[in-house]
Amino acid sequence: DAGRTGEWAEFLDALAGHPELAARIIMLPGNHDVNVVDRANPARLDLPFSPGKRLRQMRTLSAIAAVQGDRVRVIDGSGKPSATLNQALEPYQDRITQFAQHGGVRRAMAVRGLFDDQFPMVLPPDQDGGLGIAILNSNAETHFSFTNALGLVSEAQTRRLEAAIRHLPTSCWIIALHHHLMEYPMPVKTFAERIGTALINGSWFVRRLQKFSDRSVVMHGHRHIDWIGTCGASKIVSAPSPVMGAADDAVTYFYIHRMVVGPDRKLRLAEPERVEIAGS
């Protein structure tokens, strides 16, 4: 749970046994993938020029490409979803491989910016007016584990998101990111739950989403809390984790969500289907 090579290998090996499921999975980066410096020592620093952060980014990007590299597309300079992720990464494969095998500050600099430039990735609608998925990186640039949970959606990434949505003006969208946009209007057990976990610029990002909120739904994880609601006109779905904080013998659950487009071309959430998982 810290973006390590063995963890990614175990995940990909498990997924390889379920090709039909793998073909439907969409991955996005979370803070444990890229921002946990040392699980055993939360105060350990990862200096801005250290190759450690860049290495975790390349592992994450490589895993994402292994799962969906031929299905998702990156945004070109005109705002159009163009090359697939695998095509976009092809010119950098040697640099990524050399860095992964040998490390070093110079090799880290050779892939600087590559991770951020791929977001948002877009799974385009399969037909005009269909449903697409915009996949965002919401992880802030942090350098030690105490601040690993901070979230931020950059202005550059937001502009690319807006351009992609404008390029497909009749389509509807799931906007998928790891961090929650704002604090939920509900009591919490500890004050610490309200510190440094939502997007730093969440209010700003929500305002930017309002212009296409009638044809989008925001989905996120991070806090693993069961919550569905709105902020302004934006519809927001928080995904409860069926494993985080659950005892092995406890009954857990997840939701299957269905969406419909009304005659007014607005995207609506239908009542979700709750799927319960029996304890072991």
Where are these regions (language model features)?
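Short catalytic/ligand-binding loop motif for oxyanion handling, primarily in non-cytosolic enzymes
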Residues: D1-R4, V34-D38, T142-F144, M182-M186, ...
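Core catalytic region of metal-dependent phosphoesterases/phosphodiesterases
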Residues: D1-R71
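Active-site glycine-centered loops adjacent to acidic/histidine catalytic or metal-binding residues
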Residues: G30-N31, H178, G221-H222
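Low-complexity, serine/threonine/proline-enriched polar segments
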Residues: F49-R106, S280
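Conserved beta-sheet core of the metallophosphoesterase superfamily
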Residues: A88, P185, T190-P263
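Beta-strand-turn-beta hairpins that frame and shape the catalytic cleft
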Residues: D117-I135, S171-C172, T230-I236, R265-R268
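Active-site-proximal segments of metal-dependent phosphoesterases and phosphodiesterases across multiple
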Residues: A140-R159, R166-S216
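A short C-terminal boundary segment appended to hydrolase-like catalytic domains
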Residues: M259-S280
